[in-house]
Amino acid sequence: MGASTTARLGPARVRSERRSCAAERHRLVDLYRYERRLARLGLEPVAGVDEAGRGACAGPLVVAAVILGSDRRNRIAGLADSKQLTPAARESIYNEIISRALAWSVVVIPSSEVDELGVHAANITGMRRAVAGLAVRPAYVLTDGFSIAGLNAPGLAVCKGDEAVACIAAASVVAKVTRDRLMVELHEKFPMYEFATHKGYVTAGHRAALARHGPCPEHRRSFVTVRRAGGRMELRITELADSDDSPGFASGPAEAVPGPAGSAGAASAAARPAAAGPAGRLVDQNRAADLRDNGDVSRPAELLEIP
């Protein structure tokens, strides 16, 4: 900023804007640190994967995979977890991602398939499809929160990865914007539910519309809110838990998760719970198993620990 800018805005305002610009530069440097670290290990390109619509009771589940690259000249200003952005900012950053990413892929899983597979299995299936759909094959895959086997590339889960990793944040934006646009289209078809407002998530207005009109074909019958509105109340084990109940683990075979032919360990890896941890730290419980499941035992997971 030159002397004319200082005179126009005042010294205090100029200092504040300089601090803000410096903070944003540091934030972006930190956001891209996983891609830089993996590039130094010879693991490029890196794909990030995330979904939108997991907790909605209507509409599709949308999964995106994005490869950004580690070149600092190609960093996307303002990139962040989609939940931290305004709708206008998401649209702007979405356009930047689509035009500047090395590769991107989107998978839309309709509500009927979510009901058939279950939300978690549908999410895993969508992530596999999204990575397989990339025009550039990734050397490494980073996922948000839990690991995915059967990706034909080594990968790791990152706690709160959509906040800590650039390519996962980009995937979250692409998935969210894509799904929001689809929900606006569904609003035109089913205006009585106001899908354009709540995007299929449970709100007081959505509950009232369900009570008044019943569910439409885009509602997920596997969700208790929809089953109540439709007059069907099959009780599930998960609905017996009280608010103070803690998670437990069952013995026996893991639930089968659809995946590519020949992808060993898909069910067991999908059943592994993700460990809690601070944002931007790799999930300790899954790290070594991820490398083993994805066929890369030559690179210890500890190489990717980033302070």
Swiss-Prot record:
UniProt entry keywords in alphabetical sequence: Cytoplasm, Endonuclease, Hydrolase, Manganese, Metal-binding, Nuclease
Catalytic activity: Endonucleolytic cleavage to 5'-phosphomonoester
UniProt remark on cofactor binding: Manganese or magnesium. Binds 1 divalent metal ion per monomer in the absence of substrate. May bind a second metal ion after substrate binding.
Residues the record lists as binding a divalent metal cation: 50-51, 144
Biased composition (Low complexity): 250-280
Recorded GO CC terms: cytoplasm; ribonuclease H2 complex
Basic and acidic residues bias (residue ranges): 287-296
Pfam families per UniProt: RNase_HII
Principal cellular location given in the protein's record: cytoplasm
Cofactor needs: Mn(2+); Mg(2+)
Subcellular location: Cytoplasm
Molecular function as annotated in GO: manganese ion binding; RNA binding; RNA-DNA hybrid ribonuclease activity
UniProt cross-references to Gene3D superfamilies, sorted A to Z: Ribonuclease H-like superfamily/Ribonuclease H (3.30.420.10)
Location of the RNase H type-2 domain: 44-235
GO biological process, one term: DNA replication, removal of RNA primer
Known EC number: 3.1.26.4
Region (Disordered): 241-307
Family per similarity comment: Belongs to the RNase HII family.
NCBIfam families membership: PRK00015.1-3, PRK00015.2-2
Reported function: Endonuclease that specifically degrades the RNA of RNA-DNA hybrids.
Protein name: Ribonuclease HII
Record organism: Acidothermus cellulolyticus (strain ATCC 43068 / DSM 8971 / 11B)
Encoding gene (name): rnhB
